[in-house]
Design a protein with these regions (language model features):
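Solvent-exposed, flexible loop/coil residues
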Residues: 11, 25, 37
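Catalytic and substrate-binding regions of cell-wall glycan-acting enzymes that process beta-1,4-linked
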Residues: 22-26, 81-133
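Low-complexity, Gly/Ser/Thr/Pro-rich intrinsically disordered linker/tail segments
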Residues: 133-139
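Short, functionally critical alpha-helical segments immediately adjacent to catalytic or ligand/cofactor-binding
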Residues: 1-18, 65, 86-92
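Alpha-helical segment that forms one wall of the substrate-binding/catalytic cleft
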Residues: 33-85, 89-97, 117
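Divalent-cation-assisted or electrostatically stabilized phosphate/pyrophosphate-binding catalytic cores
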Residues: 29
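Short helix-coil transition/hinge motifs at the ends and kinks of transmembrane helices
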Residues: 19-20, 50
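Short linear functional motifs in flexible/disordered or boundary regions
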Residues: 12-13, 53, 77, 101-102, ...
Length: 139
């Protein structure tokens, strides 16, 4: 979510420009926290039965990403713990994943996601250590 929308619930890809100045159409239908495209969002709603899910609701976006990550693990055999390859599959789609090596920009983004993931893992481990160490302290 940090990489895709920077936690902006109304995030959309920037418009393309006609003649370098006139705002034109957007390059995709991605929208919301998860930047899910319409077709994949509809597939998520149908498969999960979550018909009222919206791309602007944080809870739904997080659930969507979990659903997508789970499907990526089963379809492409990419571990849920592999943030780099999971992000490549998320950004490029299940069909486009195989061609990611031709896209240096996406590889750079995936490296940033992997770095952020490692930071979150470290923070979580530090929290767990502190909570386990001070479990009998009353606030």
């Amino acid at each position: 979510i940090k990489m895709e929308s920077d936690f902006d619930w109304l995030a959309k890809p920037p418009r393309q420009k006609l003649f370098k100045i006139i705002p034109f159409k957007r390059p995709s239908s991605s929208f919301g926290y998860s930047q899910a495209v319409k077709g994949t969002w509809e597939q998520y709603k149908n498969e999960t039965g979550n018909k009222l899910a919206t791309r602007t609701r944080f809870k739904d976006s997080v659930d969507f990403i979990g659903w997508y990550t789970d499907k990526t693990e089963s379809l492409l055999k990419i571990s849920k713990k592999d943030a780099f390859r999971q992000y490549l599959a998320y950004h490029e789609g299940w069909g486009g994943y195989k061609d990611y090596k031709n896209n240096q920009k996406v590889i750079g983004l995936a490296k940033k996601v992997e770095k952020q993931s490692n930071k979150y893992k470290s923070q979580l481990q530090d929290c767990q250590k502190r909570l386990n160490k001070n479990k009998y302290i009353i606030f």
